[in-house]
Amino acid sequence: MQNRHHARLLPSSALLSHEAAAGVMLMAASAIGMVFANSIWQASYEYWLNIETGPLTMRGWINDALMALFFLLAGLEIKREILYGHLSHWSQRLLPGVAAIGGMVVPAIIYVAFNHSGEALRGWAIPTATDIAFALGVLALAGSRVPGILKVFLTALAIVDDLGAVIVIALFYTGTLSVLPGAGVAAILGLLLMLNRQGVRTLFPYLLAGVPLWWLTLKSGIHPTVAGVGLALLIPAGHDEASPLMRLEHMLSWPVRFVILPLFGFANAGISLHGVTVGQMLSPLTLGVGAALMLGKPLGVLGAVSILQLSGASGFPPYITWRHRIGIAFLCGIGFTMSLFIAILAFPGTAAVNQIKLGILSGSMLSGLCGYILLRGPAVADR
């Protein structure tokens, strides 16, 4: 029975190849951004990203508007997994849920150990996230050597991580609230809830309401990407592929993974290395983020899994070796997209962002490399 249950939960090869391709696209776009930021095109790169178009710059439209669609998709995936997927039963939620909490708490503690005072403390949440596109991309490179149950575990953990990141952004990175726009946000959410309760399954009214919801959220002082999650939670769900939730998820999946996330990587991963000193590379901000991702994430995930295994509450099957566990824990240290996003919120328009980005890039790359090396070992068949 347990074997059939595991088999039912294994993600399809099509899904994994889709995620892997998205991860490769994100890596490529980020690398191109780095090339532009350190070449003769640096001035043009910065100029185009900082052109004001309406109320926002080009970078602002990417980070505040397009990324709201990323959070809408993330919210839909979280809702689907909790209702019908890998997290639909408490027994399924326990292992990835506790591992995700451990993987958020320990990196935050390590970051604070390096940056325990002043403005730097605002970045405590930066190393707490896992980039599912990057992580699954690296996992796909290891091929059939990786037991399927680890792919399920990583996917479920990243979903819980996304949920934690959304809560952190809403609670800790919201500015001064404006009453009237905030009231408008509440009114639109109330209207959407009413539509949901009345059984309205046409997507159009939900998407139409999403536009003023985003605008009022932006004006209220709450980060506008939170509007995407709020909208996702009120989209009607269902078991079948024809449900509004599933239809919208399919509509958003390709443009978010292959257009929006690469654009985000291109616009935000570009760090100018001209004039970077050893002191900056070894600054508490850079070291704090890098160490938190590369050491804190795997320690937190492994520690949480070990506690559950020893207590008998949950755990991996016996054929999952320590090499597999450590390898998958290292992949959780690939923070990238969400870490960059939180860094921008924590240190808007400051010189500290470049030091943070160095830590994110170095910590994520080293975590991915360590995870890949460990998972490239001899294949283990699923049982």
Curated annotation (Swiss-Prot):
A Gene Ontology molecular function term of the record: sodium:proton antiporter activity
Membrane-crossing segments per the record: 21-41, 56-76, 94-114, 123-143, 152-172, 175-195, 202-222, 258-278, 287-307, 326-346, 355-375
Alphabetical list of InterPro entries matching this protein: Na/H_antiporter_dom_sf, NhaA
Reaction(s) catalysed by this chain's protein: Na(+)(in) + 2 H(+)(out) = Na(+)(out) + 2 H(+)(in)
Compartment annotation: Cell inner membrane
Cellular-component GO terms for this entry: plasma membrane
Keywords: Antiport, Cell inner membrane, Cell membrane, Ion transport, Membrane, Sodium, Sodium transport, Transmembrane, Transmembrane helix, Transport
Single GO BP term: regulation of pH
Domain of life, source organism: Bacteria
Keyword Transmembrane annotated: yes
UniProt topology in membrane: Multi-pass membrane protein
Family listed: Belongs to the NhaA Na(+)/H(+) (TC 2.A.33) antiporter family.
Cited function: Na(+)/H(+) antiporter that extrudes sodium in exchange for external protons.
Protein's name according to its UniProt entry: Na(+)/H(+) antiporter NhaA
Organism from which the protein derives: Granulibacter bethesdensis (strain ATCC BAA-1260 / CGDNIH1)
